[in-house]
């Protein structure tokens, strides 16, 4: 029985070990992060990417955060009613996406979709054109409803 274990179990154990090594582990990058919330009816708070808190304040506040490659699960809170939001989509980041990047911005849209943008060097991320247009439209709608 002891010889059987050595003959059969050794190759099986080695094969399973190699499968684990080749499955493509995640790599962690430390980037300066921020977030932009485009819904004018509330301010997002405690924005998290894979459980790691990122900066906020519509790009004004930054934080150094550990970002891993692979799927990016994003959540955030809503200040006025203490609602917890979960992103409807799941962006994916690769090593190539993150290589040489300094900043990561999470963009939170009113329909709970998210977008991630990355910048190099000392170039701070900006709000997206789409986000600013959506925000402007919602502000106009809020102003119209206040007039009634």
Where are these regions (language model features)?
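Beta-strand-rich cores of mature extracytoplasmic or soluble domains
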Residues: 82-148
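C-terminal motif of bacterial Sec signal peptides marking the signal peptidase cleavage site
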Residues: 17-20
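Tryptophan-paired
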Residues: 42-83
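Short coil/turn motif common to extracellular beta-sandwich-like domains
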Residues: 26-33
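Structural motif
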Residues: 33-41
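Bacterial signal peptide processing site
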Residues: 22-24
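Bacterial N-terminal signal peptides that target proteins for export
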Residues: 1-9
